[in-house]
Amino acid sequence: SLGIGLTLEIKLDGDSMTVCIPADKIQESENKGIKSIELMPFFGAADHTVDGYLLYPDGCGAITKYANVDQRSKNVKAFTWDIYGAEQVDFNECKQMEKDQKYQAMLPIYGIKNGDNAILAAVEKGAEDTSIKVSPDGFIVNLNRASFAFNYRHFYKINLSNIVVNGASVLRNTMGTRVDKEMIKTDREVRIFFLSGETANYSGMANTYREYLIKSNLLKKVIIENDNIPLALELFMGIKENRLLFDKYVTMTTFKNAISISEELKNAGVDSMQVMLKGWTKGGYGLYPVNWPPEKKLGGKKGLREFSDYARKNNMQIFMRNNFIQADSKNRGFSTRNDVVMQGSNLPVTGMGKTEFLFNPFFALQRFVSFFNEFSRWCSEGVALERIGINIYHDYNKANPAGRAETIEKWEDMLDTVIRNQRPAAVEGGNQYVLKYADRLCDIPVRSSQYNITDEEVPFYQMVVHGMIPYTSEAANLSYDLTMHKLKLVEYGCMPYFELTYSKSTNLNNTEYNKLFTSYYINWYKQAADIYNEFNERLKCVWSQKIIEHDKMEENTYRIRYSNGITVYVNYSKNDIECDGYSIKGKDYIVVGKGGVIN
């Protein structure tokens, strides 16, 4: 009666099943359309009497256990994650999420375990316009369930005071919501893997998904057998301090200083480093959209070339960090009408101060290509791209409209440009579309958003990626407990990572980067070298290996098994414990080889 219809195509494919909704077989009436379709919302649903849980990719990964239904509020709600980031383009909401440590879904998956059986569902087509919905027992019905919702139209806000009838505004200072007229015309397809027995758990799901990504050429192999675990060193170089009359440039690390710090670390035994330079461009960090040239006060182009030569001679991998997505109108160099992301109301997407903008994906790619051509004339280093593994968005810009799929294409074009020119590419964030390009992943979360439906955090993302692409989480020098931070690196398989400066961090107190509250290299380089040497002595044997099993043995104790037969036990408690017949000291870890030999 609504004049709406669709076709659901279901096919069995070995030990998996595909479910597809072809775009050309969706029917809509003249005045009625589809906003979203929730696919098979009760497939695999179970109540609290079943031994099982729901898995979802919130940050590192999280699970909701059926048995804990009584520990949840009677008014428990479902939670939804937009895959690859929020559907609504909102500067302020994005900043608040990061401030509150709320994470997004970087992988387009969910899992359901019911006793000795489990499913893993993964979006194969249309992930960028899909949401993951997790509904615990007690929300509407007494069933635990998870599903995908395919989004076919976006909502956008309009100012209702702009609507005029008979010469007068209908509603003053009131915002309303509209929906796109045109449907997103892409096929949607989900693959559902069936697991049983010993594989019917989140470890089995991670193994299944990793092998699927490898087979589909969606996950790059970067780490080579017997590689050292590199020290990830980020050097913060410069930033402007805003003052009443004249801004002051604050120099934290020059190119010559970068060589000095690298030498200190090398002399302390660090012979494998990945160095990332941050705030190296003219004007300093955060002066978007300036991407070139190097700041003269840091040594300019000559200093960059000297550091590049030093790095090449010492077999160091260098990444020059840059941002091609964000812009600030105070810095000029772009049009706030033609070059930035627009809302459906034909107004630009801005932050609270109305000076922050996002670049249209086509314009962002154009700026990147221009930068890369000039950059390549001066050095042969790698590029680190901020935000492209975190942010995708749609743009109503009339000159160059873009959906979320087109935005991903432009981000992939940037990465492809780097790789085709035989440069390494680092990416901030780890959305799945970067995994076939990235040589390094930055800021990968080692926790979930800790919503009230979550019972346990699991390193699902790390289990998929470990042994393939190196990744970092948070800077060790900014942790409040270095020992506990180190144990988290061991459990989650992260590179040791420090963000340091040549000058004292107190120089940043009056800048917008005062979050780097302890970074003076004199205070940290020995600890960085100690962790590097310890990890390579004890954990090098698993660096290139896949994590095939992760188990919580008891409170604060975890067992991680690798594809070469080596097992690592991590004890976060202050007390010594016994686990599987092995003694583990408080706040420590052990590495057990195939023959039971402890390292």
Each language-model region and where it sits:
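Active-site-proximal substrate-binding groove within the catalytic cores of carbohydrate-active enzymes
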Residues: 104, 112-158, 182, 327, ...
